[in-house]
Amino acid sequence: MNQSNCIVAQSGGPTVAINASLAGVIAGVKSSEKYDICYGAVNGILGILNENYLNLSDIFADDANLEKLKTTPAMYLGSCRHKLPDYKDDDSPYVYIFHQFDKLSIKAFFYIGGNDSMDTVLKLSDYAKKINSDVKIIGIPKTIDNDLCMTDHTPGFGSAAKYIASSMLEIAHDTFIYAVKSVTIVEIMGRDAGWLTAASALARNEYNTAPQFIYLPEVDFDKDKFVADIKEALAHTNNVIVAVSEGIHDADGSYITSSKAACDQFGHQQLSGAGKALEFIVNENIGVKVRSVEVNVLQRCASHLASLTDIEESFAQGKKGVTIAAEGVTASMVCLKRISNDPYQVEYTYSAIKDIANEAKSVPRDWINDAGNDVKPELIEYLKPLIQGETAVAYKNGLPDYMDVSHLHKCN
């Protein structure tokens, strides 16, 4: 009987939950009668082009390692931001990739990633159809930005939202201690979609109203209105905390940043400095104590504060990818459909990759207040279930005990 194997890779920016999705793929292969060996390509699609593989079936033969993988941050297989050309312009990488699939007896390829990774899934799917390949191409979602279409929310977002809300509450406690007027601006990831920044509203409780203002890229930023907002708030409280997306822009579409940003291979500006830019505005126009805080990579790698709901759903979506591939599905991405909020229930399904790749899901305008400086209760209700539950992270010598990833930082 001919061997039937599969290969999985991770791509794009890391999250707390992407390794849980990888664990789900490995577990799905373990329990599948369809596939024999699960290979892992190191550093995304480049791992296939460079023939850099790991035998994940061997590495994770012990279920204890699989459990540890689920709570290990970032990407066990490493990542890349490599954009495949259109095969009509240059099919050489496609020829090579599918040659490697044949060489390894690959019958399914799973790509765990966000928008740009789904572009790769679409291109490989189209090429597979062109050459009548029987390799199933499946996308497994991942992004803290929560901007993938056709799915209720994305793996990694819930944990990042939990970290953002927790950090916002802790920052609020830090500011409460001084009886002086102050403004704290917290810059949160989100180039085109403000889901993560919106999650800062979850920090509000019976004694904390921070953040008092939330500015998202879905609404044009107005400097004069921002200054007026802050002045009005300072008339009623000593401490004002602002949550701002890194991708806020003015009515002309120009980003509000403190410096000119470079672009990655997919043409996305690598933004930073929105918080610092707002700090300058407050300093020049209001003159109170002001500081900006850039949460940066911490929001996407804090496994010690992961959402159990997020980890469990991410694992299940990895397994679902294996299931649908074994059933003959291809050119698709695993999706979540929300059934209800209370009790919180979801259904695992899938959608055609052509309806997902190169599209983006923004925060609905009717979930943002009319003033454009806060979110509505509907968004809070959407977010709440996603941050529930805590994971049991193993500790060693007082620190989290994660999977060894020394294979990722060896010199080439």
In which residue ranges do the predicted regions lie?
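Glycine-rich oxoanion-binding loops at beta->alpha junctions
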Residues: 52-107, 116, 155-157, 169
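C-terminal non-catalytic interaction/assembly regions of soluble proteins
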Residues: 255-412
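Accessory alpha-helical/coil subdomains and C-terminal extensions
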Residues: 38, 100, 108-113, 119-132, ...
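Gly-rich Lys/Arg/Thr-decorated short loops/hinges at beta-loop-alpha junctions or inter-strand turns
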Residues: 2-8, 69-83, 142-152, 179-182, ...
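N-terminal phosphate-binding or glycine-rich loops at protein starts, especially the Walker A/P-loop
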Residues: 1-54
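Short glycine/serine/threonine-rich phosphate/pyrophosphate-binding segments
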Residues: 15-25, 48-49, 93-95, 115-123, ...
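Short, ordered loop/turn segments at secondary-structure junctions
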Residues: 11-13, 41-46, 81-82, 114-115, ...
